[in-house]
Amino acid sequence: GVPSLSPSSKTYHTYPKGGEISVSLTTNTNYTVEILGDAKEWITQPQTRGFREDILSFFISENNGDKRTGEIKIISENEETESIITVEQESYIHEGNISIRGNQKLQEIGERGYKQINGNLDILCFNNNKEDMITSLEVLNSITQINGDLILNNCDIENFNGLNQLRKIQGDFVIESLNNFNRIESFNGLDNLDEIGGDFIMKDRLPYNGEKSTVNSNFSRLKDFKGLENLKKIGGNFQLIGLGYFRYQNSPYYYTSFNELESFEGLERLTTIGGSFKISSEGNDKYVTFKKLSSLNNLTNLASIGGNFEIYAPEYEIAQLNTIELPTLKQINGYIYMRNGFYMGNKNRMNLVLENLEKLGGFECKSYTILNALKLKRIDEKLYIGVTASKVGSINAQEILNGLSSITYVGKDLRIDCSGIESFEPLGNLEFVGGDLIFDIGSSERNNLQSFIGFENLTTIGGRLIWGTGVSSAGSVSTYTSFSNIQSFQGFNNLSSIGGFRMSINYGDFSKFTSFAGLENLRQIKGDFTIEVEDSFWGLSDISALTNLETVEGSEFKIKGCYKLEDFTPLKQALTSYQGTFSTYSNGYNPTKEQILNGEGKQ
């Protein structure tokens, strides 16, 4: 008959660590086997002849290089027919994402022995088959680098053993759980991890479709970050997110998470967080998160945070976290947001001690926070102190100013709740505000300010100089009077340029205010100039300090309600070049622009 050579398969795939493959060959002739080309270096075969139905064995050497392909030729003895077998051996470097759902798939991936994954490694430990539940990552002990994300979802593991060789995660490291991760106490098993290129996030997750659990406990034994002693850099965000109470698809879900976490021990070598640092707790008095967290002190080498620094606990405070000391932190490029129980009016004072901080993106204080940053000279964006929430802002605004005494530059708005302010002297080094300078006061608050002394070095306000904005601000109707001891603008003596000027005065506010003294050096207003007064007893009678004002560039120049003001001649120089709408009414005298320019500016 016709000679026949029929291998059971034309292509064989092998793992990078090598091993043996068997080829089932059906034949009716004698044959020889030839391993072609460079494949001789990594494919060997002890048997070269057989008859009829044979099993050919080949030994595959370990592959420490790129993926490779070899060919084996089987030739009949008279060379009348031949068959080619292709052997494809994977590299220890896997190209593409790996998604693991359950233990069977985990064992299969572990058997391949990958050292590097050029993609994401996504592991969902829990599925509906409890026998296929992942309880250990031991089989992944060959992986040294993941050039994508590492996502661990809902795992019942006791530790991270199996990831002991992992040195770098190029993307995000995300650990998320719905009623799981309750056996880990630390990060033991990640001892060699020195860099996370993206985010490092641990979080409660929302339920998937079909998951019915409404009361969830996550990370319930985690005490610290031991095991991450070699981690030096997180390129993205570092976030711990506890949901507490959450409504999802019209159903309530409750979480108690991170309640044994006491410290950040284990992260002593972390120097850089490229994104934001955030601890988020949305629990209430029954479903609490971060119950024992009392310190961030183990972040002893952290020098830079590229995004925001945020403690977010709007409903129920993280009660043990009273003092945060980060002595090596020099730079926060984003904002400091401190919201520890402020919606509920909690009065747990947080002391934020950043003694070597030199650069800050911005600061919004809406909680009982004392910021000690005596080396901080520059804030690139906004500085908000106790704004819009007088019950929490007024109690510590003065203490916050005291801790910012080296500030020379605020890039955008500077907004201050003045309810608790007695002196602006700590701002004596301030030279520049790029946005608005806004003074607020609570509608049921009073203050003891005597003057604006403290702003003597301020020369430029890029935005407006504002008093009386919003409902809880100077100018609100209340049983108290706001800024009742202020008589003039003394303190702004070197101010030469502002982006606009606005005073909105209601009944009883600025009750002793009589003159614009202190603004003698003001030369330029790049926007509108408006004064609106609703108090017929208001005492402003002297604007002679505006004699040197050269230009007002806005579309509106308005003075209303200054019943004692009768002399507008100091505005003559500014009105000479003014192109907008000028109006005066309900004053002691109400001249037009033309009257002032013609020498009739005084009654």
PLM regions and their residue ranges:
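Concave beta-strand-loop units of leucine-rich repeat
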Residues: I98-N103, N120-T135, Q145-E158, Q170-E185, ...
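A short beta-strand segment in extracellular, disulfide-stabilized domains
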Residues: E20-S24
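A short beta-strand micro-motif common to beta-rich folds, especially ectodomain repeats
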Residues: L56-F58, D66-N78
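Bacterial Sec-dependent N-terminal signal peptides
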Residues: G1-T11, T81-I98
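Surface-exposed binding patches on compact interaction domains or structured appendages
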Residues: S4-P7, T26-S57
